[in-house]
């Protein structure tokens, strides 16, 4: 493939790491953000020290604070902004974009209120004549590892196989490998919902529980996010792949995960408002918990772990009491794994 001009919207840890991958593959990368000091740092010092203290970026990666300039003559746009601002940024893109491009996103969350997936937001806000089918790029990936070129394998899902292949071709190299997928709903919901379970896994660690409990929350968490995903139209097999169990393992077991760290702090008795302030980064699992809980209520899907985490986050339930509530639930068979009514 010829070198592409690619705008990466969102200069956070993952947006920065993906920018480096694309740059390594010979593409012209333009990072866009609205923090003028951060954009100047990337351009002048070739660093993004808010997220990576010791990483020097290639000087060919350019940062823009003006969206119209960042999008000028690009071949593709990669959204890596927080879920809560995705719709706003998509509206801005639609206002200044002058030609048809490939649209990809690597964000993980559900919109508050609407419960929309990211691809749904992008489809609603960016006119069809300006884009192809949306591509979801998601899977087990810590930005801290990708930025130092550690091996990473993730999924690229789209309703148009050619669009998924495009994503695969611009990203894949010796350390970063994409697999195509057609289950957009599955890949997208798996990436969003696993953040909830990661908060719970971190809380167990903060409470002092061991590996048995952590394995339990990951496997039972996988069961309930699969139930919700299938109810939304996903294929159950997707949740056993990279974007499902793969992402759940990496996010639910590692200190690199901000969702896990937030849960760990919750388990040690800290309040979520203080945790978010101290971390200084978006914790997608917090807002996703609320959206998923409301969606599960609407669809009548049983999600006991999600419900408990919701009560800890939004109703001041003590985390240890929440664990006991789950353990005291009526016993049942394990083989209701995919049964969306259990």
Swiss-Prot record:
Keyword Cytoplasm belongs to the record? yes
- Reactions performed catalytically: sn-glycerol 3-phosphate + NAD(+) = dihydroxyacetone phosphate + NADH + H(+); sn-glycerol 3-phosphate + NADP(+) = dihydroxyacetone phosphate + NADPH + H(+)
Entry GO CC: cytosol
Q: Where does sn-glycerol 3-phosphate bind?
A: 108, 139, 141, 194, 247, 257-259
Q: Name one GO biological process term.
A: glycerophospholipid metabolic process
Localization, per the record, is: Cytoplasm
Keywords in UniProt for this one? Cytoplasm, Lipid biosynthesis, Lipid metabolism, NAD, NADP, Nucleotide-binding, Oxidoreductase, Phospholipid biosynthesis, Phospholipid metabolism
InterPro entries recorded: 6-PGluconate_DH-like_C_sf, 6PGD_dom2, G3P_DH_NAD-dep, G3P_DH_NAD-dep_C, G3P_DH_NAD-dep_N, NAD(P)-bd_dom_sf
In which family does this protein belong, per the annotation?
Belongs to the NAD-dependent glycerol-3-phosphate dehydrogenase family.
**Free-text function comment from the UniProt entry:** Catalyzes the reduction of the glycolytic intermediate dihydroxyacetone phosphate (DHAP) to sn-glycerol 3-phosphate (G3P), the key precursor for phospholipid synthesis.
Database matches in HAMAP family = NAD_Glyc3P_dehydrog (MF_00394)
The name on file for this protein is: Glycerol-3-phosphate dehydrogenase [NAD(P)+]
Which organism is the protein's source? Answer: Lactococcus lactis subsp. cremoris (strain MG1363)
């Amino acid at each position: 493939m010829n070198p592409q001009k690619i705008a990466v919207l969102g200069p956070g840890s993952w947006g920065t790491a993906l920018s480096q991958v694309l740059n390594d593959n010979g593409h012209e990368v333009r990072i866009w953000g609205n923090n003028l000091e951060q954009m100047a740092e990337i351009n002048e010092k070739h660093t993004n020290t808010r997220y990576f203290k010791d990483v020097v970026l290639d000087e060919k990666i350019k940062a823009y604070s003006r969206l119209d300039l960042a999008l000028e003559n690009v071949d593709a746009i990669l959204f890596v902004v927080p879920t809560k601002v995705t719709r706003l940024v998509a509206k801005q893109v639609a206002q200044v974009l002058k030609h048809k491009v490939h649209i990809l996103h690597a964000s993980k969350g559900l919109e508050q209120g609407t419960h929309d997936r990211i691809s749904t937001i992008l489809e609603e806000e960016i006119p069809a004549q300006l884009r192809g089918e949306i591509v979801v790029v998601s899977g087990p990936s810590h930005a801290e590892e990708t930025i130092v070129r550690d091996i990473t394998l993730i999924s690229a899902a789209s309703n148009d196989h050619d669009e998924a292949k495009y994503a695969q071709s611009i990203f894949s190299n010796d350390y970063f490998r994409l697999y195509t997928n057609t289950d957009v709903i599955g890949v997208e919901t798996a990436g969003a919902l696993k953040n909830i379970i990661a908060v719970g896994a971190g809380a167990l660690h903060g409470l002092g529980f061991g590996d048995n409990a952590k394995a339990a929350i990951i496997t039972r968490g996988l069961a309930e996010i699969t139930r919700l995903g299938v109810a939304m139209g996903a294929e159950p097999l997707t949740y056993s792949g990279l974007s499902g169990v793969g992402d759940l393992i990496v996010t639910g077991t590692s200190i690199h995960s901000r969702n896990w760290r937030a849960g760990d702090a919750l388990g040690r008795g800290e309040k979520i408002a203080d945790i978010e302030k101290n971390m200084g980064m978006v914790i997608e699992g917090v807002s996703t918990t609320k959206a998923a809980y409301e969606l599960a209520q609407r669809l009548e899907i049983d999600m006991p772990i999600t419900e408990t985490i919701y009560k800890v986050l939004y109703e001041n339930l003590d985390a240890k009491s929440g664990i006991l509530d789950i353990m005291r639930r009526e016993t049942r068979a394990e083989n209701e794994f995919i049964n969306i009514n259990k």
